[in-house]
Amino acid sequence: MKYVLTIVALAFLVFSAQPSEAVEALHTYDSMKEDTQELASQYPEIAVYSEHGISTGLDLEIFSVDVALNITELSDEELHALPTMYVDGTHHGNEGMSAEASFLFLQDVLQRSAADPSYLEGKRLVVTPSVNPDGYVLDCRSNWNGVDLNRNYPYMWGMYGTSD
C-alpha cells in the first residue's frame, strides 16, 4: 500500500510541479507511435520501447515504453521486482486526450530522470499511450469488435453495464 501512495504522490507532483506547454493538436496513431519510439530512443539508459501485439481489426501495434534506472542492465527478475506504475490511454478510442496525457507524462518523467537519476531510483514505469488503437484511429469508444474495453474485463463479462 505504501508503494501505491508513493506512486500516486509522485504522479501528483509531476503534474503539479510546473506548467506545461499547451497541446495544440492531438497525435494521430502513426505520429504517436513514431514520437513514442523517438522519445524512448533519446533515453536509452532508462527507456525501452516495445510492441506487444496487434489490434483486432486494423492490425495496429500495441506499444509501450518501460522506464527504470539502468533498464538494459536489469534482469527480468530484477525489473519485475521493482514497484511498478502502469499508465495507459485510450481505453475509449474517442478520448484522445488520454493518449496525449500518458505521452506527456512519459516525456516529463524521462526529462526529470535524465536531470536527476535518483528520480527513478527503485521504481519502474510502464506507459502504453493507446490500449485501443482501433478505436483511437476510428475515433470511437469501442474496439473493432464493438467492445468497450473499459467495461469488459473477464470479471462478470456480459453482465449488466457491459457492452457486447
Give the ranges of each region predicted by the language model.
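Active-site/substrate-binding loop(s) of hydrolase catalytic cores
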Residues: 78-91, 96-164
